[in-house]
Amino acid sequence: MMQRARWTITMIFVLLSMNTIAQDEGRFDVSLLNRIYDFPNSVDTTVFHGLDIYTYRKLKINVVRRNLILFPIPTMYRIAHSKARDYIEENYSVCHLYNTKDYTIERLAHTSTIPQQKETMTRLQKFLTPKFYEETIFGNSMLSPFHRNNRAYYRFQFKILHDNQVEITFYPKVKNTQLVTGGVIVESKTGRIRWGKIAGEFDMINFTLNFVMSDDKLSPVIPQSCELNAKFKFMGNIVKAQNTAIYGMPALNKDSVGSLTMRQLMDSIRHDTLTTEENAIYTKYYAALAQDSTEAKNVKRSWAKRFFWDVLGDNLLNKISSNYGNGNQGQVNINPLFNPLYMGYSGRKGYYYKFDVRNLYNFSTNHYLYTRLKAGYSFKQRQLYFTLPIEYHFDKRHNGYVKLQLGNGNWISNGMLKDEMLASLPSNTPYNGERIDYFRDFHLTLESSYDWSRHITLQVGMVGHKRTAVERHTYQQAHVPTSYTSVAPKAEIIWRPTGWRGPAVNVAYERSIRGLMDADLAYERVEFDIQQIVAFNRLKFLSFRAGCGFYTLFDGTSNFLDYSNFRDNNIPDGWYDEWTGEFTLLPSHWYNLSRYYVRTNATYETPLLALSHIPLIGRYIEKERIYTNMLFVTHLHPYTEVGYGFTTRWVSTGVFIAHRNGRFDGVGIKIGLELFRQW
């Protein structure tokens, strides 16, 4: 009996000891994670101000498998039609840091075996600047396991090592493209990460990143070196890449640059020697270059073939980006002129193609000119939509600018004009019933804007519209006008009660005067609008919008009910357009039927909300949204929409349910193409 009691007491003591040890280990784990979370607060970030960081980067590419689909993928055109399978690229640059978030990068030396010294897979550069202590590791993607806000997404295992070091292994609780796996070595007393490894998949790139954090020479919150192994797979194409980046390299001795070739210069900069395989890539490239030069002297290359492959093909399928001016103060960016990846589909407008050109020219640090041509062609409507703003910014600090904008806007309906026309139309005259009440809208706006303070912005200007009947011939047969013109002075004031990060209240007034610059329409309109985005963290936020508008003067049946803050979006632009402030299922004619409107829109966006937790498909979901929209106009009291949306590497999708005056009004799906948007 005594022996059994002694055994029982011993076991209780052992169990209590084990529980105490487990509690101590748990407290150690939590305290270590807290030290990691708080470590950036102990780092002096003023060292970044005015700091120049010299960087060496090497990229080796192996094209394992390729087909015609590789051609239109951004930056892939050169390696898609080249005969070679292996490439190497080296880069030496300097990063001029002004603060922790403001910097410019200047390329000092570059050599590449990619045809015409082009760059490829530039998307990988983002993976070479990880920020482990911030909420997202790479820009606005991939949640860091070492930020307090992401603690709920990861599991951790700890192993105590010697010399005050701890090995931490981490993996996500659910498989998702926004989460990573890996391990790091951490100083247990400070929470400082020394080196480690992470792996994940994002935007069709599977990657493994080995990194060493910087010593005190730079800053312990930025890496000293990164080695990236990546694989890109898409519709039968497989491309592997090895990317190395070394930060804190010695500054370039400019006195010795002039006498060296670019290859010799890179040999003198490189932190170590090339491998046998890398040297072989260079040797094969220069041998082929010499052979092409010899053959060119004997056989004149077909001009048509060179133009098609080297000029036309590249510019048609790839983005064009270039600097110009004596000091490279100008920059132009052109989306592909013809690339099937920029196609889209909308139920009302059918298939459409989007096109975008941006131009920026800096006259000084405070003055610049910005222009952007954004266009889209609807094949169903046989209509080219475009907007062309030309902005001259004269005071960068106060966002002072003068803007001239041209555009042809949406098709706008006018049922009253249609009824008048049909009453005058000879009987038995055929017409297109689907298009008869629509008018094309060409508009011209001239306005000036100035931020008088962080609370007040004032805008004044004029806006003109010329609206022409889509079925112009039918209106001519009825002997009624086919076009109408309005010219309106306008004023707008934006009030931010708490400054830039709070809500913005907008009051807009517009008055068209008959006879002003040959205008034949008169109206007066007032709109109120309030918008706010509440950011809970880097990837989770709530956006809210509410507003109303009404016509105080409406002269005759020939006028058009058209609002600035309540209008149809003619060319949808995917996840990053105004999905958070528009009505997805509302037929387009409702935007132009009422002399008033009252609307509210709210959207909640976050990763890992619902579908992300479903096996197999959840791993591909990047972000998710919940939508709620409500509208009051004539004959709609109210119109409501609720929806759920998500975005993946391929498409963004939204499912919406509409109710009209309390009754079910339908279900709809909206799809936007996201493929290679970030490339």
Give short role names for the model-derived ranges.
Residues 349-353, 382-386, 440-444, 481-489, ...:
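Residues that define the transmembrane beta-barrel architecture of outer-membrane proteins
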Residues 157-158, 163-261:
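Gly/Pro-enriched, hydrophobic low-complexity segments
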Residues 23-165, 174-179, 237, 241-345, ...:
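Structured extracytoplasmic
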Residues 353-359, 388-392, 444-450, 462, ...:
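Residues on the lipid-exposed face of transmembrane beta-strands in outer-membrane beta-barrel proteins
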Residues 401-418, 428-434, 500, 506-610:
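C-terminal outer-membrane beta-barrel translocator/porin domains of Gram-negative envelope proteins
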Residues 194-200, 228, 333-345, 356, ...:
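Transmembrane beta-strand segments that form the barrel wall of outer-membrane beta-barrel proteins
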Residues 363-369, 397-402, 454-460, 467-470, ...:
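Repeated loop/turn-to-beta-strand initiation elements of outer-membrane beta-barrel proteins
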